[in-house]
Amino acid sequence: DVYKRQVVASRPGVYALERAANAGVEGVVVRRKDYASSEDFDAALLKTLKEHNIDLVVLAGFLSVLGPSVIEAYPRRILNIHPALIPSFCGPGMYGLRPHEAALARGCKVTGATVHFVNEECDGGPILLQKAVDILPGDTPEVLQKRVMEQAEWKLLPKAVAMVCSGEIC
Protein backbone atom coordinates (compact mmCIF):
# COMPACT_ATOMS: atom_id res chain seq x y z
CA ASP A 1 0.00 0.00 0.00
CA VAL A 2 1.09 3.54 -0.71
CA TYR A 3 0.25 6.24 1.79
CA LYS A 4 0.37 9.88 0.83
CA ARG A 5 0.42 12.24 3.76
CA GLN A 6 -0.21 15.92 3.94
CA VAL A 7 -0.71 18.30 6.84
CA VAL A 8 -3.34 20.96 6.26
CA ALA A 9 -3.32 23.60 8.98
CA SER A 10 -6.09 26.08 9.70
CA ARG A 11 -3.54 28.75 10.67
CA PRO A 12 0.13 29.42 9.94
CA GLY A 13 2.88 28.85 12.47
CA VAL A 14 1.33 25.82 14.17
CA TYR A 15 3.66 23.14 15.48
CA ALA A 16 2.08 20.52 13.20
CA LEU A 17 3.57 22.29 10.17
CA GLU A 18 7.03 22.26 11.74
CA ARG A 19 6.69 18.57 12.60
CA ALA A 20 5.51 17.83 9.06
CA ALA A 21 8.47 19.63 7.52
CA ASN A 22 10.89 17.79 9.81
CA ALA A 23 9.35 14.49 8.68
CA GLY A 24 9.44 15.39 4.99
CA VAL A 25 5.66 15.73 4.79
CA GLU A 26 4.15 18.57 2.80
CA GLY A 27 2.26 21.14 4.83
CA VAL A 28 -0.19 23.75 3.61
CA VAL A 29 -2.32 26.38 5.29
CA VAL A 30 -5.98 26.83 4.37
CA ARG A 31 -7.43 29.62 6.52
CA ARG A 32 -11.15 30.27 6.66
CA LYS A 33 -10.56 34.03 6.91
CA ASP A 34 -8.90 33.99 3.48
CA TYR A 35 -12.23 33.13 1.84
CA ALA A 36 -15.38 35.17 1.38
CA SER A 37 -17.67 32.39 2.57
CA SER A 38 -17.65 29.04 4.33
CA GLU A 39 -18.52 27.45 1.00
CA ASP A 40 -15.44 28.98 -0.64
CA PHE A 41 -13.27 27.74 2.24
CA ASP A 42 -14.73 24.24 1.95
CA ALA A 43 -14.14 24.27 -1.82
CA ALA A 44 -10.49 25.27 -1.32
CA LEU A 45 -10.02 22.61 1.35
CA LEU A 46 -11.63 19.94 -0.84
CA LYS A 47 -9.47 20.98 -3.79
CA THR A 48 -6.32 20.60 -1.67
CA LEU A 49 -7.39 17.19 -0.37
CA LYS A 50 -8.38 15.91 -3.83
CA GLU A 51 -5.19 17.22 -5.49
CA HIS A 52 -3.18 15.11 -3.07
CA ASN A 53 -5.43 12.02 -3.28
CA ILE A 54 -6.17 12.10 0.44
CA ASP A 55 -8.44 9.23 1.53
CA LEU A 56 -8.56 9.82 5.30
CA VAL A 57 -8.82 13.21 6.99
CA VAL A 58 -7.65 13.46 10.59
CA LEU A 59 -8.60 16.60 12.50
CA ALA A 60 -6.26 17.40 15.38
CA GLY A 61 -6.49 20.98 16.51
CA PHE A 62 -8.09 22.07 13.22
CA LEU A 63 -10.22 24.91 14.55
CA SER A 64 -12.68 25.20 11.68
CA VAL A 65 -15.96 23.35 11.41
CA LEU A 66 -16.15 21.47 8.13
CA GLY A 67 -19.10 22.15 5.87
CA PRO A 68 -21.45 19.64 4.25
CA SER A 69 -19.51 19.44 0.97
CA VAL A 70 -16.35 18.25 2.74
CA ILE A 71 -18.23 15.86 5.03
CA GLU A 72 -20.19 14.38 2.11
CA ALA A 73 -16.97 13.88 0.11
CA TYR A 74 -15.42 11.86 2.97
CA PRO A 75 -18.18 9.79 4.61
CA ARG A 76 -16.73 7.92 7.60
CA ARG A 77 -13.30 9.09 6.43
CA ILE A 78 -12.90 12.14 8.69
CA LEU A 79 -11.71 11.58 12.26
CA ASN A 80 -11.79 14.19 14.99
CA ILE A 81 -10.24 14.17 18.45
CA HIS A 82 -12.27 16.01 21.10
CA PRO A 83 -10.87 16.87 24.55
CA ALA A 84 -13.81 15.53 26.56
CA LEU A 85 -15.87 12.39 26.95
CA ILE A 86 -18.63 12.99 24.41
CA PRO A 87 -21.55 13.60 24.96
CA SER A 88 -20.24 15.85 27.76
CA PHE A 89 -18.74 19.25 27.03
CA CYS A 90 -18.97 19.09 23.25
CA GLY A 91 -20.62 20.87 20.37
CA PRO A 92 -20.28 24.39 19.00
CA GLY A 93 -17.83 26.53 20.96
CA MET A 94 -16.38 23.63 22.96
CA TYR A 95 -12.73 23.64 21.92
CA GLY A 96 -9.38 24.62 23.40
CA LEU A 97 -9.60 25.18 27.13
CA ARG A 98 -13.41 25.41 27.21
CA PRO A 99 -14.19 21.70 27.74
CA HIS A 100 -11.65 21.61 30.59
CA GLU A 101 -13.05 24.78 32.15
CA ALA A 102 -16.55 23.32 31.93
CA ALA A 103 -15.52 20.00 33.50
CA LEU A 104 -13.84 21.80 36.39
CA ALA A 105 -16.77 24.19 36.86
CA ARG A 106 -19.18 21.23 36.97
CA GLY A 107 -17.09 19.48 39.60
CA CYS A 108 -16.41 16.40 37.48
CA LYS A 109 -14.08 13.75 38.87
CA VAL A 110 -13.07 12.46 35.42
CA THR A 111 -12.85 13.85 31.94
CA GLY A 112 -10.99 12.51 28.93
CA ALA A 113 -10.89 12.46 25.17
CA THR A 114 -12.97 11.03 22.35
CA VAL A 115 -12.13 10.10 18.78
CA HIS A 116 -15.18 10.13 16.53
CA PHE A 117 -16.14 10.17 12.88
CA VAL A 118 -17.22 13.61 11.71
CA ASN A 119 -20.77 14.07 10.49
CA GLU A 120 -23.05 17.06 9.99
CA GLU A 121 -23.58 17.51 13.75
CA CYS A 122 -20.70 19.21 15.57
CA ASP A 123 -19.06 16.48 17.71
CA GLY A 124 -22.05 14.26 16.92
CA GLY A 125 -20.53 11.55 14.75
CA PRO A 126 -20.14 7.90 15.74
CA ILE A 127 -17.65 7.41 18.57
CA LEU A 128 -14.65 5.18 17.87
CA LEU A 129 -12.60 5.42 21.05
CA GLN A 130 -12.70 7.14 24.43
CA LYS A 131 -10.28 7.31 27.32
CA ALA A 132 -10.97 8.68 30.79
CA VAL A 133 -8.52 10.90 32.65
CA ASP A 134 -8.80 11.72 36.35
CA ILE A 135 -9.35 15.29 37.44
CA LEU A 136 -7.10 16.00 40.41
CA PRO A 137 -7.57 18.48 43.27
CA GLY A 138 -6.08 21.84 42.35
CA ASP A 139 -6.21 21.24 38.59
CA THR A 140 -6.39 24.32 36.42
CA PRO A 141 -7.79 24.19 32.88
CA GLU A 142 -4.25 24.38 31.51
CA VAL A 143 -2.93 21.55 33.70
CA LEU A 144 -5.96 19.41 32.88
CA GLN A 145 -5.63 20.13 29.15
CA LYS A 146 -2.00 18.96 29.21
CA ARG A 147 -2.90 15.77 31.13
CA VAL A 148 -5.77 14.95 28.75
CA MET A 149 -3.47 15.44 25.75
CA GLU A 150 -0.68 13.32 27.17
CA GLN A 151 -2.76 10.53 28.72
CA ALA A 152 -5.61 10.31 26.22
CA GLU A 153 -5.44 12.31 22.99
CA TRP A 154 -1.90 11.34 22.00
CA LYS A 155 -2.72 7.66 22.58
CA LEU A 156 -6.23 7.51 21.10
CA LEU A 157 -5.71 9.32 17.82
CA PRO A 158 -2.88 7.14 16.44
CA LYS A 159 -4.78 4.04 17.55
CA ALA A 160 -7.96 5.19 15.78
CA VAL A 161 -6.05 6.02 12.59
CA ALA A 162 -4.43 2.58 12.63
CA MET A 163 -7.82 0.92 13.17
CA VAL A 164 -9.36 2.76 10.21
CA CYS A 165 -6.35 2.17 7.94
CA SER A 166 -6.28 -1.55 8.76
CA GLY A 167 -9.99 -1.90 8.04
CA GLU A 168 -10.77 -2.85 11.63
CA ILE A 169 -13.17 0.11 11.69
CA CYS A 170 -14.89 1.35 8.55
Language-model features: locations:
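Short beta->alpha connector loops at strand-helix junctions that form conserved
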Residues: 28-33, 89
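Generic alpha-helical structural signal
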Residues: 21, 43-46, 146, 158
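Short Gly/charged-rich anion-binding patches and loops
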Residues: 15, 44, 98
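Short, small-residue-biased leader/transition segments that mark boundaries at the very start
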Residues: 2-3
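Glycine/small-residue-rich loop that forms an oxyanion/phosphate-binding "nest" at active or ligand-binding sites
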Residues: 37-50
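Donor/substrate-binding cores of folate-linked one-carbon enzymes
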Residues: 10, 56, 60-170
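Non-catalytic terminal and connector segments of soluble metabolic enzymes
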Residues: 8-27, 47, 51-56
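Short alpha-helical
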Residues: 12-15, 36, 64-65
